[in-house]
Swiss-Prot record:
Domain F-box: 21-71
NCBIfam families from the UniProt entry: F_box_assoc_1 (TIGR01640)
PANTHER family from the UniProt entry: BNAA05G37150D PROTEIN-RELATED, F-BOX ASSOCIATED UBIQUITINATION EFFECTOR FAMILY PROTEIN
Pfam families, sorted: F-box (PF00646), FBA_3 (PF08268)
Highest taxon listed in the record's lineage: Eukaryota
Protein name (database record): Putative F-box protein At3g52320
Annotated source species: Arabidopsis thaliana
């Protein structure tokens, strides 16, 4: 009797130990992508090891293109570097949320350190969440979200050199363009040469096939801008002639475009309704005027008639007096403005001016506590870039 009772108890224990396996229906791939696309990049890097399916989805071009859609939430970065000491730099980041001030202007606060120890040097360009920067002749590409860095082959030319970085949407490739040039004592460019590198395994520099007028960058550390797979950058052919160069990232063809303004000082190039435009702000500090011409035909160097935008009276106190630094924004029809010099322990403020709506669309602030040694002198910084990424 006792032995049979023990057997019965053991059977019940074994039954309890049995695990119930429930087979759940598989999540459709499109639904899985919709879920994963909402996650930050750091989480996606970890989730690649969940399964082979997740790895293939996260690393696919389709997923990457959806992840970097302009409409997706973006984070604002600021990159500061000292021209005299390229190892002295800061990479700062805004929090994900923004607030509104009393005038209903969106306010973003750059309040987080994202500095990566082995970075440094000048920022070349930011494209679809990746940063390209250089120190000397070393060019590197960094993903600030995953903190991964790739160093490109060293450029061996002994002449002057500068770079640009962009994304070719037709072939879904990232390319780095290098320009080498030689000038006379009169600053006339006698020779220039371009090389291009496609980012990937075994990447190497090669000469471009397209011929072009010898030129050099408009000024040192000159950044370009990309619209629909075409890279645009300012250039000089001699001391008295400035032009706009275009480089098709797919066909790798160059085009020289004459500028619409005879006086090209204090001009920037920007995205205006999907077209490249030249913005001249010579009269901004005195009168609040910004003049814009839009490129209509690149082959004929044909521009639209000049259109003048007038800054709101409420913002004239900001632009009046001290020298302004004006830069292009990723957003169409908007420019970034900041003071060239700031006082110690003062917030670094940037304004995103929407020319179409004639209003300050966004205010960007950098907390003084993040600036460290950059805040020890009245000369706030030598080079400052702000850019958006996923």
């Amino acid at each position: 009797m006792g032995s049979s009772l023990c057997v019965a108890v053991r059977k019940k224990e074994k039954q309890k130990q049995k695990k119930t396996v429930v087979f759940l229906p598989e999540i459709p791939e499109e639904m899985l992508i919709d879920i994963l696309i909402r996650l930050p990049a750091k989480s996606l890097m970890r989730f690649k090891c969940v399964s082979k399916l997740w790895l293939s989805l996260i690393t696919s071009r389709y997923f990457t293109n959806r992840f970097f859609k302009p409409s997706s939430p973006s984070c604002l970065f600021a990159y500061l570097v000292d021209r005299e000491n390229q190892s002295k730099y800061l990479l700062l980041q805004s929090s994900s949320s923004s607030r509104h001030d009393h005038s209903d202007t969106s306010v973003s606060v750059i309040d987080q350190h994202s500095t990566i120890p082995i970075m440094g040097g000048y920022l070349v360009n930011a494209a679809r969440g990746l940063l390209c920067y250089r120190t000397g002749r070393r060019v590197k590409v960094c993903n600030p979200s995953t903190r991964q860095i790739v160093e490109l082959p060293i450029m061996r030319s002994k002449t002057n050199v500068w770079n640009w970085f962009g994304h070719d949407p037709f072939h879904d490739e990232y390319k780095v363009l290098s320009l080498f040039w030689e000038v006379t004592k009169e600053q006339t460019v006698v020779r220039s040469e371009h090389q291009v590198l496609v980012l990937g395994v075994g990447a190497s520099w090669r000469n471009t096939k397209s011929h072009h007028t010898p030129h050099r960058p408009f000024h040192p550390y000159s950044r370009g801008m990309t619209i629909d797979g075409v890279l645009y950058y300012s250039a000089r052919t001699d001391a008295n002639r400035c032009v706009l160069m275009s480089f098709d990232l797919s066909s790798e063809e160059f085009n020289l475009i004459e500028l619409p303004f005879e006086n090209w000082s204090r001009t920037i190039h920007m995205n205006y309704q999907g077209k490249v435009a030249t913005c001249q702000y010579m009269r901004l500090a005195s009168d609040g005027f910004v003049d814009v011409c839009v490129l209509e035909d690149a082959d004929k160097s044909q521009w639209s008639n000049k259109k003048t935008f007038v800054l709101p009276i409420s913002q004239m106190n900001f632009v009046h007096g001290d020298r302004l630094v004006v830069g292009a924004s990723r957003d169409s029809g908007k420019v970034l403005m900041r003071k060239a010099n700031l006082l110690r322990n003062q917030h670094a403020r940037f304004f995103l001016y929407d020319m179409e709506r004639n209003e300050i669309a966004r205010r960007i602030e950098i907390r003084p506590s993040l600036l460290g040694s950059f805040n020890k002198t009245n000369q706030f910084l030598k080079v400052c870039y702000t850019f958006q990424t996923k």
